[in-house]
Every structure is written in structure tokens, then in C-alpha cells.
């Protein structure tokens, strides 16, 4: 949902967003948006409500009600409704309703709630629920929260059954919040009301698949009083239907070496055409290539391919293991080129390893492409295995993985960011408990992982790239030897793990560029 505003004002220490010519004001409360009007008595509340851990149940909402009651805050859960707004999560912490004013993010530490929200165990979650797009003067209420780990920044997939977007009608604000609106509109210039006395409804732009349902929340002091069956609202939800940008799917098209060669040969032409096109799918591809391939990444130093060509390799690997990719979208763009380039890839000068899958043809171009995609998969696999080993070593004795002063050059920013992403997945894939590493140990693991990534991104080879951590992890040579046998055209558990690490780092780079992966379920 999007809410336009014209200006902002700070009143009673809370930031209000002024709309409708000064007649309406919004404020953020624990990730929800609350609306008050100068003349109308309606109070609108928009936000996510808590549901269950699977479609059709309300176990999460009921659990939060129980916890609020245990803390002596049963009054915070609405009466006569199955829905509990997400701002109630803030009241599970030592916060008051006033403390939640202005908060667009919430932290969750309850292990049961954490696992219900992301279907994985974790020590804590940070939920972002509202974005203030100041340049557009728009408050954006997210259809599902953006969930990350507060310390590592790892981005989680959201359990859709846990949340639902709802518009609520409140006959009054909670008593603790009523002080916020006293005298609010005295300091806001208003427009003259129409002579007819009628006011136009406020448009709320809905970008989701359907309108948010409405409900009425009865006053706390009238908990047993029946609600009106029908509510006439000051708001009208306006559906916004954009041109599709859903280029992501978990299924690729033709995952043959020949098609990959064609894509690599045409990648730069695809990108040039997409940059000049007006459709949203082309714009999404251009943004994704820029976000992922602008900085060094897997295959940067070990292949002579361009950023667009390496991007095609990443999509092949993700599609090959049924992870979200835009490989099928790239195939469609290749077919629409006016003149389809002949298959031909840049030569790979690394020369130390054979390319699996060479049975598809004896051409030099095909061999170079196979070699390049294998190198990307092998680098991602080695990074993942080394990170898992670092986590296990840090649990036993974290100082052992510290880099001796001056032994290695400073790591780059993109390597540190990618290593932080890899750490979270490594913890889940290792034998360590989720909370076994303290902050200092996590920092040591991330630093060691960044040193490995800088070596891989620079094309130093698997053995040389892992040398900085060899003192603490003596079996790295065995890991490198095993990875050197992997091929992107075969099947093995190690290759799958490498593809998963590639995807996590790939998705994190998109997230840092404010790009979301929304699957096209028609593919």
C-alpha cells in the first residue's frame, strides 16, 4: 500500500505525515500506519496482522495473545477479532505504545515466533514494515515484511501464511496515544471545506494482488459491545497494476551447453537492447546485472568474460539447481534480438582445469563457456565449504582463525558484505548451534571469509585463495581438490551447496540495491 503526503510535522515528539491539503495526518506505529482526520471521527489503521504458521490457522496470533496476557498486557490485543496487528510484537518487549510511535522496524527474539515467520531457527529477526520514500513523498506499507538477521544482515524468505495486510476502522485511539493528536491540526494550515459538505475519500494505492480486507476494532472499554456490521470508510483502495517485472522463476528453459553458449555470446547485445527498451522486464534485467556484476564476484578474475556474460553464467547455475533465476527471461530476450549473435565466448586464460560437459561439442567457444561456468560453481562451492569449516573451528577456538597482524592485505567492502551473508548460511549448514558464536567470533569468521573471497574474486585459484585460512583449516587443500572435479552439468550434493551459496550472495547483492526477487509463478 502507498500513502501520499504533502509535508511533515513533528508534534508531541512524533513525526506526522500531512495529506489531503492538511486535513489528514499519518503516523507510523510499530510498523503500522495510523490515520487521523481533522473533521472526520474515523481513525484508520493499516498494517500487517499476525496469522499462523500455515494457511488457515491462527497459532501465531493466539500465541502472541497468550504472551501479552502473561506479561499483563492483554489489553493490547483487539477484542472480538482473530487478527492481531504486528505492532503488538513490540509490546512483547519492554516498550510502551508511545515508544512504538515512529518505529517502522521491529525486532523479534522469541524463538517460536522467529521459526514461524521464516521457517528456520535463528537467534533474532529484524522486520522492516514501512518505507518512507521521501523523494516521492510516499509512505509505503509493505505487503510482507523484509526480514533480516540483525547482526549478520542475512535476508530470510518470509512465511506468507504468517502475515496478512489489513485495513482497520478504530472508533478511538488507545488512551496512551490520544495525547498525540491533541492540538495536532492547530499547527497545520487547512483548506476550506467544499460547500456541499461532502469530502472526497482518500485514495490508497494498492500494489498487491488484491485489496486489503477491512475490519472494525471495538474500543477497549466496550469490549463486549457488538460492532457495526458495515463501516463506511473515508478511504478507497485503488488497485495499481504495473507492467510485469516478474522475471524470476525457479525453472529455466533449455539448460543445454549450446543454449548457454548462445546466451553468453548474446549477453552484451541483450543488455544493450534492454537498456534502451521501455518495458519493465528489460529494466529489471539491467538493474540486476548492474547490482551483481558491477563489483568483483565469482568468475571475475578467473574468466575473461564481461559482466553481462558472467551474469548469464550465474543464472544458468541457479536455474540448473531450481533456484530463483532470470535464465528463462534471458532466453526470451535472446530470441527477440534482431540479429542473434553466433555462439562464441571469450577465451579463458586460466587454463588449469578441464571443463566438465565438454561432450556437447568440440568447439573452442563451447569449451571456454563450460570451463567458465564450472569455475564459477567451484569458487562458490569452495567458499561455502570453507565458511562452514570456519564456523566449526570458531566454535572450538575462535582466536585460532584470526589473521596475524599484517599477514594479509585489507579486505574489500564487497568481499566483507558477501562474507557476512555467507556466514549466516554457513551456520545453518554447519554442526554448530545457531547461537554458538558470539559477536567477536562472527567478526573473525567474516574477516577470514572476506580474505578468501578477495582471492577468489581476483582469480588467484582455489588453492591460493584459501591459503590465508590454511593455518587454521589444514584440510582446505582436500576441499579444493574435491571442488576441482565439480561440473555445472552434473549432479552432486557439493555442487548443490555451491549453488545455494551463490544464490544467497546473489540475492544479498540485489537486496542491497533495493531489488526484490518476486517469482513469476506462471513459469
Swiss-Prot record:
Biased composition (Gly residues): 353-362
Cell compartments where the protein resides: Virion tegument; Host cytoplasm; Host nucleus
Record keywords: Host cytoplasm, Host nucleus, Virion, Virion tegument
InterPro entries recorded: Herpes_UL21
Keyword Cell membrane: no
A cellular-component GO term for this protein: host cell cytoplasm
Family per similarity comment: Belongs to the alphaherpesvirinae UL21 protein family.
Described purpose of this protein according to its UniProt entry: May participate in DNA packaging/capsid maturation events. Promotes efficient incorporation of tegument proteins UL46, UL49, and US3 into virions. May also play a role in capsid transport to the trans-Golgi network (TGN).
Subunit structure: Interacts (via C-terminus) with UL16.
Main localization (coarse): virion
Species of the source: Suid herpesvirus 1 (strain NIA-3)
Region (Disordered): 340-364
Protein name: Tegument protein UL21
Highest taxon listed in the record's lineage: Viruses
One Pfam match: Herpes_UL21
Amino acid at each position: 500500500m502507498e500513502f501520499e503526503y504533502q509535508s511533515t510535522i513533528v508534534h508531541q515528539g512524533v513525526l506526522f505525515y500531512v495529506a489531503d491539503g492538511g486535513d489528514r495526518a499519518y503516523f507510523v506505529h510499530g510498523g503500522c500506519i495510523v490515520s487521523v482526520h481533522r473533521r472526520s471521527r474515523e481513525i484508520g489503521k493499516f498494517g500487517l496482522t499476525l496469522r499462523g504458521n500455515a494457511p488457515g490457522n491462527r497459532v501465531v496470533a493466539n500465541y502472541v495473545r497468550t504472551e501479552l496476557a502473561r506479561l499483563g498486557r492483554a489489553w493490547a490485543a483487539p477484542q472480538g477479532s482473530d487478527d492481531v496487528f504486528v505492532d503488538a510484537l513490540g509490546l512483547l518487549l519492554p516498550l510502551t505504545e508511545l515508544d512504538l510511535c515512529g518505529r517502522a522496524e521491529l525486532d523479534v527474539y522469541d524463538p517460536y515466533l522467529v521459526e514461524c515467520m521464516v521457517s528456520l531457527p535463528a537467534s533474532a529477526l529484524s522486520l522492516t514494515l514501512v518505507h518512507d520514500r521521501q523523494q516521492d513523498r510516499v509512505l509505503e506499507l509493505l505487503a510482507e515484511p523484509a526480514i533480516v538477521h540483525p547482526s549478520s544482515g542475512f535476508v530470510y524468505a518470509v512465511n506468507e501464511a504468517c502475515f496478512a495486510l489489513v485495513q482497520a476502522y478504530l472508533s478511538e485511539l488507545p488512551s496512551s496515544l490520544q495525547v498525540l493528536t491533541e492540538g495536532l491540526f492547530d499547527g497545520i494550515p487547512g483548506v476550506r471545506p467544499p460547500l456541499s459538505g461532502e469530502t472526497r475519500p482518500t485514495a490508497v494505492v494498492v500494489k498487491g494482488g488484491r485489496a486489503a480486507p477491512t475490519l472494525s476494532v471495538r474500543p477497549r472499554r466496550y469490549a463486549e459491545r457488538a460492532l457495526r456490521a458495515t463501516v463506511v470508510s473515508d478511504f478507497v483502495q485503488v488497485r495499481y497494476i504495473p507492467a510485469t517485472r516478474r522475471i524470476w522463476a525457479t525453472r529455466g528453459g533449455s539448460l543445454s551447453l549450446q543454449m548457454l553458449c548462445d546466451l553468453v555470446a548474446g549477453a552484451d547485445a541483450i543488455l544493450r537492447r534492454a537498456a534502451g527498451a521501455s518495458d519493465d522486464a528489460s529494466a529489471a534485467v539491467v538493474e540486476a546485472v548492474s547490482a551483481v556484476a558491477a563489483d568483483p564476484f565469482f568468475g571475475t578474475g578467473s574468466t575473461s568474460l564481461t559482466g553481462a556474460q558472467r551474469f548469464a553464467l550465474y543464472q544458468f547455475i541457479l536455474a540448473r539447481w531450481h533456484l530463483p533465476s532470470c535464465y528463462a527471461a534471458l532466453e526470451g530476450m535472446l530470441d527477440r534480438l534482431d540479429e542473434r549473435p553466433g555462439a562464441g565466448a571469450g577465451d579463458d586464460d586460466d587454463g588449469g582445469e578441464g571443463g566438465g560437459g565438454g561432450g556437447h561439442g568440440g568447439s573452442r567457444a563451447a569449451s571456454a563457456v563450460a570451463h567458465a561456468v564450472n569455475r564459477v560453481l567451484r569458487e562458490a562451492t569452495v567458499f561455502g565449504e570453507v565458511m562452514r569449516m570456519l564456523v566449526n573451528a570458531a566454535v572450538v577456538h575462535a582466536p585460532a582463525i584470526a589473521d596475524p597482524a599484517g599477514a594479509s592485505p585489507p579486505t574489500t567492502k564487497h568481499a566483507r558484505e558477501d562474507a557476512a551473508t555467507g556466514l549466516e548460511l554457513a551456520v545453518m549448514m554447519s554442526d554448530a548451534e545457531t547461537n554458538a558464536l558470539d559477536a567477536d567470533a562472527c567478526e573473525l569468521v567474516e574477516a577470514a571469509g572476506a580474505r578468501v573471497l578477495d582471492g577468489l574474486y581476483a582469480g588467484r585459484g582455489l588453492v591460493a585463495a584459501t591459503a590465508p585460512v590454511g593455518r587454521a583449516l589444514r584440510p582446505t587443500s582436500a576441499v579444493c581438490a574435491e571442488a576441482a572435479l565439480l561440473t555445472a552439468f552434473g549432479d552432486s550434493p557439493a555442487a548443490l551447496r555451491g549453488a545455494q551459496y551463490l544464490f544467497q550472495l546473489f540475492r544479498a547483492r540485489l537486496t542491497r540495491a533495493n531489488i526484490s526477487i518476486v517469482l513469476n509463478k506462471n513459469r
